[in-house]
């Protein structure tokens, strides 16, 4: 019998773990962290704090574009990193894709769209019931707008293409990267959520329903 879950998601910590995250253990089954866990390596001790929470719930992370190789190694040492990996929990396949598409800022963990596509397609192509944990948001959604007045989209076109091509199999895409684009959106059947640094989401797999809450209201 499938156990329904509550999945909580956060993103863009930049080395600071909101105190409320420790309370997630009281109700969450899985915590996903969508990258930029540190600020170019600063605040790396936050990874150990996340690892401590894995005694109470599954903790699944991907690195962001601002996370260095040292950060990735630290995530691996605590077995939290699901970048380009699959972690099956109950009937859901959690798939991670870390880093971002190219930015103007030459950050440590950026890739071409071709690289992103090749990294992700090889993981998702034979899977069903996928929960995608991505740092970069899919292109042309409410999750990737950098200037809310000018409607400029900067997300990954490869991630969007894969969501479109495997729309029946990808039920959810949790992402971050663009701090100002806090949203719940959809691409076809796929729920897309960017909680932004100031919020977290809770996804109820039984109801197939997601809500966003501010940390200051916890």
UniProtKB/Swiss-Prot annotation:
Source species, domain of life: Archaea
- CDD domains for the chain: MPP_PAE1087
Q: Which InterPro entries match?
A: Calcineurin-like_PHP_ApaH, Metallo-depent_PP-like, PAE1087_MPP
Family matches, as SUPFAM superfamilies: Metallo-dependent phosphatases (SSF56300)
Molecular-function GO term, any one: hydrolase activity
Q: Which cysteines are joined by disulfide bonds?
A: none
Q: Which residues form the signal peptide?
A: none
Task: Specify the protein name.
Answer: Uncharacterized protein MJ1162
* Species annotation: Methanocaldococcus jannaschii (strain ATCC 43067 / DSM 2661 / JAL-1 / JCM 10045 / NBRC 100440)
């Amino acid at each position: 019998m499938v156990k329904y879950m509550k999945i909580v998601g956060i993103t863009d910590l930049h080395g600071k773990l909101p105190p409320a995250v420790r309370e997630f253990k009281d109700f969450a089954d899985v915590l996903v962290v969508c990258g930029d866990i540190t600020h170019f390596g600063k605040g790396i001790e936050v990874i150990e704090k996340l690892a401590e929470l894995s005694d109470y719930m599954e903790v699944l992370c991907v690195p962001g574009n601002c996370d260095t190789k040292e950060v990735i190694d630290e995530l691996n040492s605590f077995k939290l990193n699901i970048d380009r990996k699959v972690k099956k929990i109950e009937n859901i396949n959690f798939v991670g894709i870390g880093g971002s598409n190219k930015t103007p800022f030459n950050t440590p963990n950026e890739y071409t769209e071709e690289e992103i596509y090749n990294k992700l397609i090889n993981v998702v192509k034979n899977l069903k019931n996928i929960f995608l944990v991505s740092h970069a948001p899919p292109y042309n959604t409410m999750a990737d707008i950098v200037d809310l007045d000018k409607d400029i989209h900067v997300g990954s076109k490869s991630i969007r293409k894969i969501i479109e091509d495997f729309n029946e199999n990808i039920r959810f895409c949790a992402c971050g990267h663009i701090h100002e684009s806090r949203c719940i959106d959809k691409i076809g059947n796929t729920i897309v959520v960017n909680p932004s640094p100031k919020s977290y989401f809770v996804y109820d797999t039984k109801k197939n329903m997601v809500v966003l809450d501010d940390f200051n209201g916890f």
